[in-house]
């Protein structure tokens, strides 16, 4: 199996992030706190810090790799930037100016900004003002018709992709004079105004989640709540879009392993591999952790029987369903809510990543021994 370490930290985990040297992990145990653990051995983790400032559930955590700062957001509509001073983490309040919950957060590639998605149909772009010694929040208020479920920065540090429960994926310019430079790799976005919409994708007819850019920034991927995953090439005026449907439960988040391979995680409790062939056509490949590639020959009648048994609480059907889950890996016992790469940002390939879920576990996966099984796309 590709999983190399599994540890249960809590009853449930909302989100998690790793320190720059990967020796510590920050997680929210589905409450108002952020717990920081340090690995003493493969089987033993020590809790070093408990960050307590939020009044409601912490919904997003990101740990910067260069400045070693932690940013957190919560349903209490606030954000904190935590700096390590001596042996203590010191918080700085960031007033987001939201009237609904903050749902997700991510540092920009240069770590001079971070983006916050919210239930207020708004995206906050926050940056630090040296003159006033505080964090400023600029709002992108237009276009979104519902909650912003995820945000993803383009490698050029200017473009930002978002997904929303209105079913749409959008790309905005976040160029801020005095913060961003005009020598951005993408020439036109640096000339656009802050908050200007570059692209809107209407591919999903259900809630959309988990948007991510490929390492080069040429491809965009996100998922829909209707068990669909979408891939968009040549993001711009004439994008090339593909939709891949799968028969299992919906995904919640995705991660590009390489330019032609994506890992998706969600309600099926096991990572799924999608890859593009030599012609650029994307398809589902297999589950990570199962002993062999997923077979398309499984009878739909047996699947219906399992579902029927679950609905009526049948013990025999429940056992069958559990056996099927174990054959796919069985690392997580509940929905996987987040996937985080383990390695240097901007790397063309990701060999290791971690997942966390509602079962309170964090699993570390290593694809080093699976390259032959995953094929040339890796």
Swiss-Prot record:
<feature type="repeat" description="WD 7">
    <location>
        <begin position="331"/>
        <end position="375"/>
    </location>
</feature>
<dbReference type="InterPro" id="IPR001680">
    <property type="entry name" value="WD40_rpt"/>
</dbReference>
<feature type="repeat" description="WD 1">
    <location>
        <begin position="8"/>
        <end position="47"/>
    </location>
</feature>
<keyword id="KW-0963">Cytoplasm</keyword>
<keyword id="KW-0853">WD repeat</keyword>
<dbReference type="InterPro" id="IPR015943">
    <property type="entry name" value="WD40/YVTN_repeat-like_dom_sf"/>
</dbReference>
<dbReference type="Pfam" id="PF00400">
    <property type="entry name" value="WD40"/>
</dbReference>
<dbReference type="InterPro" id="IPR017383">
    <property type="entry name" value="ARPC1"/>
</dbReference>
<feature type="repeat" description="WD 4">
    <location>
        <begin position="143"/>
        <end position="182"/>
    </location>
</feature>
<keyword id="KW-0677">Repeat</keyword>
<comment type="function">
    <text>Functions as a component of the Arp2/3 complex which is involved in regulation of actin polymerization and together with an activating nucleation-promoting factor (NPF) mediates the formation of branched actin networks. Arp2/3 complex plays a critical role in the control of cell morphogenesis via the modulation of cell polarity development.</text>
</comment>
<feature type="repeat" description="WD 3">
    <location>
        <begin position="97"/>
        <end position="138"/>
    </location>
</feature>
<comment type="similarity">
    <text>Belongs to the WD repeat ARPC1 family.</text>
</comment>
<keyword id="KW-0009">Actin-binding</keyword>
<dbReference type="GO" id="GO:0005737">
    <property type="term" value="C:cytoplasm"/>
</dbReference>
<dbReference type="GO" id="GO:0034314">
    <property type="term" value="P:Arp2/3 complex-mediated actin nucleation"/>
</dbReference>
<dbReference type="GO" id="GO:0003779">
    <property type="term" value="F:actin binding"/>
</dbReference>
<protein>
    <recommendedName>
        <fullName>Actin-related protein 2/3 complex subunit 1B</fullName>
    </recommendedName>
</protein>
<keyword id="KW-0206">Cytoskeleton</keyword>
<dbReference type="GO" id="GO:0005634">
    <property type="term" value="C:nucleus"/>
</dbReference>
<comment type="subunit">
    <text>Component of the Arp2/3 complex composed of ARP2, ARP3, ARPC1/p41-ARC, ARPC2/p34-ARC, ARPC3/p21-ARC, ARPC4/p20-ARC and ARPC5/p16-ARC.</text>
</comment>
<feature type="region of interest" description="Disordered">
    <location>
        <begin position="319"/>
        <end position="340"/>
    </location>
</feature>
<feature type="repeat" description="WD 2">
    <location>
        <begin position="53"/>
        <end position="92"/>
    </location>
</feature>
<feature type="repeat" description="WD 5">
    <location>
        <begin position="203"/>
        <end position="242"/>
    </location>
</feature>
<dbReference type="InterPro" id="IPR036322">
    <property type="entry name" value="WD40_repeat_dom_sf"/>
</dbReference>
<dbReference type="GO" id="GO:0007015">
    <property type="term" value="P:actin filament organization"/>
</dbReference>
<dbReference type="GO" id="GO:0005885">
    <property type="term" value="C:Arp2/3 protein complex"/>
</dbReference>
<feature type="repeat" description="WD 6">
    <location>
        <begin position="257"/>
        <end position="295"/>
    </location>
</feature>
């Amino acid at each position: 199996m590709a999983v190399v370490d599994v540890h249960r930290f809590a009853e449930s985990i909302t989100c998690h992030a790793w320190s720059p040297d990967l020796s510590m992990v920050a997680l929210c145990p589905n409450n108002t706190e952020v717990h920081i653990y340090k690995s003493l051995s493969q089987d033993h983790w020590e809790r070093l810090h408990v960050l307590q400032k939020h009044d409601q559930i912490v919904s997003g955590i990101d740990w910067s790799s260069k400045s070693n700062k932690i940013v957190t957001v919560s349903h209490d509509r606030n954000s904190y930037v935590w700096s390590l001073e001596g042996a203590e983490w010191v918080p700085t309040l960031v007033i987001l100016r939201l009237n609904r919950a903050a749902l997700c957060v991510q540092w920009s590639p240069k770590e001079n900004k971070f983006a916050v998605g919210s239930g207020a149909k708004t995206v906050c772009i926050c940056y630090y003002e040296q003159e006033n010694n505080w964090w400023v929040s600029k709002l992108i208020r237009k276009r979104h018709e519902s909650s912003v479920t995820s945000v993803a920065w383009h490698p050029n540090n200017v473009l930002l992709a978002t997904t929303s429960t209105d079913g749409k994926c959008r790309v905005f310019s976040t160029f801020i004079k005095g913060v961003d430079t005009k020598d951005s790799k993408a020439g036109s976005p640096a000339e656009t105004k802050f908050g200007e919409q570059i692209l809107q994708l209407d591919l999903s007819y259900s809630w959309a989640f988990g948007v991510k850019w490929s390492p080069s920034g040429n491809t965009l991927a996100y998922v829909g709540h209707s068990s669909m995953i979408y891939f968009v090439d040549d993001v711009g005026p004439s994008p090339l879009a593909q939709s891949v449907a799968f028969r299992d439960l919906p995904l919640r988040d995705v991660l590009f392993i390489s330019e032609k391979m994506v890992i998706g995680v969600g309600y099926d409790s096991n990572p799924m591999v999608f890859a593009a062939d030599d012609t650029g056509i994307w398809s589902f490949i297999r589950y990570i952790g199962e002993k062999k590639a997923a077979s398309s020959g499984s009878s739909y009648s047996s699947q219906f029987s399992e579902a029927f048994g679950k609905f009526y609480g049948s013990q025999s059907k429940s056992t069958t369903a559990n056996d099927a889950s174990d054959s796919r890996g069985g690392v997580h016992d509940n929905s996987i809510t987040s996937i985080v790469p383990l390695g240097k940002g901007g790397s063309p390939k990701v060999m290791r990543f971690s997942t966390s879920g509602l079962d309170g576990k964090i699993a570390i996966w290593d694809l080093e021994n699976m390259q032959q099984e995953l094929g040339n796309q890796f």
